[in-house]
């Protein structure tokens, strides 16, 4: 059970009361009808709102940005699916999609909102995702559910499997690559994902066990481990990677352990 001391409330539309009630009961969160919500204030309060169309995380502060939700059907991810850089994407290069390596089994141990997992699945990978925060898991699960209703997106998300919990407690067989994107304290004041980073900072926080995640990954029989890091951030465990794929705002530290193969 999680405890947010009324920092997170669960709200609902009439059509989704049962889902909202089950979630609030499972995780010990207060359930509030939309018409009974408290007045907005400067206090950090979030609603996990089960609306008629989606599950969304709403910042209930005065003058707050819009809601956070997962959308694989429209917007940036749909554009990347149709017009993206293909295997030229940094995440694709980092996991090793090149030449004869066309399909890999990837375990994303820190799924978040599923963006990188979706890019990899769109390129043919099978991605097993683990998310340990139940609020973030609920957002991602709902995004996957809605994507199954769109033929183009469904062909991608059918290669994505989501679990709630710790990836390394029950590590699945047949994984080629472990992908880690631990939360890191956000230093930039202006960002395209500012509202999401603020929400994650408030309800998730940084991952203090990021080093332990890499250590756990290194104990697995996998061929490669990829760690996504901000520019200037130290390497996890102080361990230098085999090589690094670097972009404008971040980098991918790649630990190449065995030769990759994939059909």
Curated annotation (Swiss-Prot):
Q: Which GO terms describe its cellular component?
A: cytoplasm
Q: Name one GO molecular function term.
A: rRNA (guanine-N2-)-methyltransferase activity
Q: What is its EC number?
A: 2.1.1.242
**Which residues of the sequence carry a binding annotation for S-adenosyl-L-methionine?**
115-116, 131-132, 181
User: Where in or outside the cell?
Assistant: Cytoplasm
**Membrane-crossing segments per the record:** none
Coiled coil segments of this chain: none
InterPro entries tied to this protein: 16SrRNA_methylTrfase_J, SAM-dependent_MTases_sf
Alphabetically list the UniProt keywords.
Answer: Cytoplasm, Methyltransferase, rRNA processing, S-adenosyl-L-methionine, Transferase
Query: What is catalyzed by this enzyme?
Result: guanosine(1516) in 16S rRNA + S-adenosyl-L-methionine = N(2)-methylguanosine(1516) in 16S rRNA + S-adenosyl-L-homocysteine + H(+)
Q: Which Pfam families is this protein grouped with?
A: SAM_MT
Principal EC category: transferase
In terms of superkingdom, the source organism counts as Bacteria
Q: What does this protein do?
A: Specifically methylates the guanosine in position 1516 of 16S rRNA.
Give the UniProt family note: Belongs to the methyltransferase superfamily. RsmJ family.
Name by which UniProt lists this protein: Ribosomal RNA small subunit methyltransferase J
> Which organism encodes this protein?
Hahella chejuensis (strain KCTC 2396)
Q: Which gene encodes it?
A: rsmJ
């Amino acid at each position: 059970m999680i405890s947010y001391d009324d920092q997170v409330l669960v709200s609902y539309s009439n059509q989704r009361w049962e889902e909202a009630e089950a979630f609030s009961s499972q995780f010990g969160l207060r359930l509030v009808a939309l018409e009974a919500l408290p007045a907005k204030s400067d206090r950090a309060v979030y609603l996990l709102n089960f609306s008629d169309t989606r599950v969304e995380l709403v910042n209930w502060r005065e003058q707050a940005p819009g809601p956070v939700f997962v959308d694989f059907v429209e917007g940036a991810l749909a554009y990347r699916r149709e017009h993206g850089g293909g295997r030229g994407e940094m995440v694709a290069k980092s996991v090793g999609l090149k030449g004869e390596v066309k399909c890999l089994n990837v375990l994303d141990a820190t799924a978040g909102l599923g963006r990188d997992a979706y890019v990899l699945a769109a390129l043919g990978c099978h991605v097993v995702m683990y998310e340990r925060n139940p609020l973030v898991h609920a957002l991602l699960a709902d995004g996957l559910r809605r994507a199954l209703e769109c033929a183009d997106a469904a062909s991608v998300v059918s290669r994505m499997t989501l679990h709630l919990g710790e990836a390394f407690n029950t590590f699945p067989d047949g994984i080629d690559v472990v992908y880690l994107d631990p939360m890191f304290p956000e230093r930039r004041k202006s960002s395209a994902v500012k509202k999401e980073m603020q929400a994650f900072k408030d309800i998730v926080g940084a991952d203090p066990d990021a080093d332990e995640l890499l250590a756990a990954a290194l104990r697995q029989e996998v061929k490669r481990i990829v760690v996504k890091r901000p520019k200037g951030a130290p390497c996890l465990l102080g361990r230098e990677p085999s090589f690094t794929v670097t972009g404008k705002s971040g980098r991918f530290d790649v630990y190449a352990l065995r030769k990759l193969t994939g059909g």
